[in-house]
């Protein structure tokens, strides 16, 4: 684990950082780098709606190509599915020996969608939290833990540069963990698919369907399997599974011990292993690339199918009753 005393901020202060993208992480990195005294510019395509936001913050914005030409450290924070094209068209033609190419996620490098030249440092700085939290913690004098990894190190100074960058966005205040592009990418994808997004979503929808098909009102089913999920996750987030079990009733705890293994059994574990193998082998990324090359048709079809599930209809009606819940723009428009 690395902390403030392990990182030299002057290293990144002596470089010119170009941040490609201004989404959740892009804005947090750019603003915090600026506040740490680092020269920073943001690369966005012509016509991007985010250009005005960058300019309002007093940061210079230009096209990705021009920013890549100016910078000697380029942090790629565009969406995963856009990175390979941006690299090929805008970044690679402007890379110079001694430049550093940084990423917030290792997918494109690990699976060979981006192949940087050998004379460029390739590293990753990945905060383990959303951009708004990264920025808020930085402003409060704190930080969000970060992962760093060095995939290519022609100068032998890649780790020091990555640590310096992490310090500039507040990461070393909380702690920085050294990893590899392989481990960060594969664990991140597995967590998303098997548990956080895919697994949780299907568990919730299936629980809802079972209750409604058994004759219970959909409103009650929604409260029990989706709405109250936040209460449980918050307890786990604060103090782990033990804290959650301590906080719920004995009835809930006892029932969970008995029934949880009936839902998630050895067969589930084997299917999770199959998902991990698909990730490790590159099969998932091949499907991801095929979807993008096909115009996102598969993704759009899956979105439509999920949006039409009855739990979404029920949920929208119930959230109209919850003044304390922040409503997404799509529901309030």
Swiss-Prot record:
Cited PANTHER family: KETOL-ACID REDUCTOISOMERASE, MITOCHONDRIAL (PTHR21371:SF1)
Source organism superkingdom: Bacteria
PROSITE patterns for this protein: KARI_C, KARI_N
Stated family: Belongs to the ketol-acid reductoisomerase family.
Reaction equations catalysed: (2R)-2,3-dihydroxy-3-methylbutanoate + NADP(+) = (2S)-2-acetolactate + NADPH + H(+); (2R,3R)-2,3-dihydroxy-3-methylpentanoate + NADP(+) = (S)-2-ethyl-2-hydroxy-3-oxobutanoate + NADPH + H(+)
The protein's name in its UniProt record: Ketol-acid reductoisomerase (NADP(+))
Keywords: Amino-acid biosynthesis, Branched-chain amino acid biosynthesis, Magnesium, Metal-binding, NADP, Oxidoreductase
HAMAP family documented for this protein: IlvC (MF_00435)
Cofactor note: Binds 2 magnesium ions per subunit.
Annotated EC: 1.1.1.86
Binding-site list for substrate: 249
A matching Pfam family: KARI_C
Lineage per the UniProt record: Bacteria, Bacillati, Actinomycetota, Actinomycetes, Mycobacteriales
Gene Ontology terms: cellular component: cytosol
Gene Ontology biological-process annotations: isoleucine biosynthetic process; L-valine biosynthetic process
């Amino acid at each position: 684990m690395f902390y403030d005393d392990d990182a030299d901020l002057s290293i990144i202060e002596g470089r010119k950082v170009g941040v490609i993208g201004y989404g959740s992480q892009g804005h947090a990195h750019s603003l915090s780098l600026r506040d740490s005294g680092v020269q920073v510019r943001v690369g966005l395509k012509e016509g991007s709606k985010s250009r005005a936001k960058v300019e309002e913050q007093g940061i210079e914005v230009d096209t990705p190509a021009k920013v890549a030409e100016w910078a000697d450290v380029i942090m790629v924070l565009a969406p995963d599915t856009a990175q390979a094209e941006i690299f090929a068209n805008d970044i690679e033609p402007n890379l110079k020996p001694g430049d550093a190419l940084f990423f917030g996620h290792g997918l494109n490098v690990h699976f060979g969608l981006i192949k940087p030249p050998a004379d460029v440092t390739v590293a990753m700085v990945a905060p383990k939290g959303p951009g708004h939290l990264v920025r808020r913690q930085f402003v409060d004098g704190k930080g969000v833990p970060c992962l760093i990894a060095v995939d290519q190190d022609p100068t032998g100074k890649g780790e020091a540069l990555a640590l310096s960058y992490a310090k500039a966005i507040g990461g070393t205040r909380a702690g920085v963990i050294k990893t590899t592009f392989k481990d960060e990418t594969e664990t991140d994808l597995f967590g998303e698919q098997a548990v956080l997004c895919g697994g949780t979503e299907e568990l919730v929808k299936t629980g809802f369907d079972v209750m409604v098909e058994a004759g219970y009102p959909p409103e009650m089913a929604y409260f029990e399997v989706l709405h109250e999920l936040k209460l449980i996750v918050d307890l786990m987030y604060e103090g782990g599974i033990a804290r959650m079990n301590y906080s719920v009733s004995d009835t809930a705890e006892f029932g969970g011990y008995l029934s949880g293994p009936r839902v998630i059994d050895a067969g589930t574990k084997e299917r999770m292993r199959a998902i991990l193998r698909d990730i490790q082998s590159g099969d998932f990324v091949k499907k991801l690339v095929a979807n993008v090359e096909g115009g996102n048709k598969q993704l759009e079809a899956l979105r439509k199918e999920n949006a039409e599930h009855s739990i979404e209809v029920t949920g929208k009606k119930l959230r109209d009753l919850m003044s304390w819940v922040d409503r997404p723009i799509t529901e309030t428009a």
